[in-house]
Amino acid sequence: MSCIRSLVAVSFLASIGVSTAVTAQEMISDTTARKQPLTTWGVQIEEFEYRYSDDDEELGVWNADAFYGTDELKLRWISKGEYSLKERAYESLENQLVGQIPISEFFDAKAGVRFDTPEGPDRTYAVLGVAGLAPQWFEVDANLYVSNEGETSAELDAEYELLLTNYWILSATLDATVAFSEDREIGIGKGLVSTGTGLRLRYDLIDRAFSPYVGVVHERKYGDSADFARAEGGGTEDWFAVIGARIVF
């Protein structure tokens, strides 16, 4: 009887040990799985709009961004363009494919390639930049470009959003382009090339996924870039009334 009791006790303790080991292994596996980087994706069309200028120019404009990856590494496709509805031609068409990694709590570094394919000469650029949230809640995107022709330039985009109510948001934008060398073939002069400023009032209609807006945009060219535009019969400064929508997937 004593022997039987001993065997039962040993079997019971062994079963507890096996159960505990299995449970511990499951906990380790679950913890390891939870530590794996979470892969996410998304599409944001920041600007999808119709513009009408003070000299009767009509444009269809978009600024879209799609991403796939983790917090440690994202792959981004960025597309921007302006299409003249009267001329039925692209005034600008830009696509970027970049990889992005965090370098601080508020900023990411990115590198990749940019393709410009408007109606005129095409250009390919190497891209190096940073993007993130600056003090006072300014969203900043700064990039350095080196073209396949050897020209270098830099671009700064900044945006500030003022929450008027839970649904009404006023957005102010600024973008500026500086060229460190001339590219006459595409109308780019050395120095400050152009600036664009915008003010848009939007309403978050559908759970912040669809937000129609109205606004005004001002664009201006400077220096040799303005001279090149005038020589081609184009303008150097425009004011646009804007209507469009911000769409997020």
Language-model regions, residue ranges each:
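Outer-membrane beta-barrel initiation region
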Residues: V22-K86, Q100-I101
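Residues that define the transmembrane beta-barrel architecture of outer-membrane proteins
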Residues: T39, E58-W62, E91-N95, D122-A126, ...
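Transmembrane beta-barrel strands of outer-membrane/channel proteins
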Residues: I45-E47, W77-G81, A111-F115, A142-V146, ...
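Outer-membrane beta-barrel translocator domains and adjoining extracellular loop/strand segments
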Residues: D56-E57, R88-L93, D122-V127, A154-D157, ...
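Residue-level signature of outer-membrane beta-barrel architecture
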Residues: Y68-T70, G99-I101, F115, G132, ...
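Repeated loop/turn-to-beta-strand initiation elements of outer-membrane beta-barrel proteins
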Residues: D71-W77, E105-A109, Q136-V140, T165-L170, ...
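Outer-membrane beta-barrel "beta-signal"
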Residues: L199-L205, G235-F249
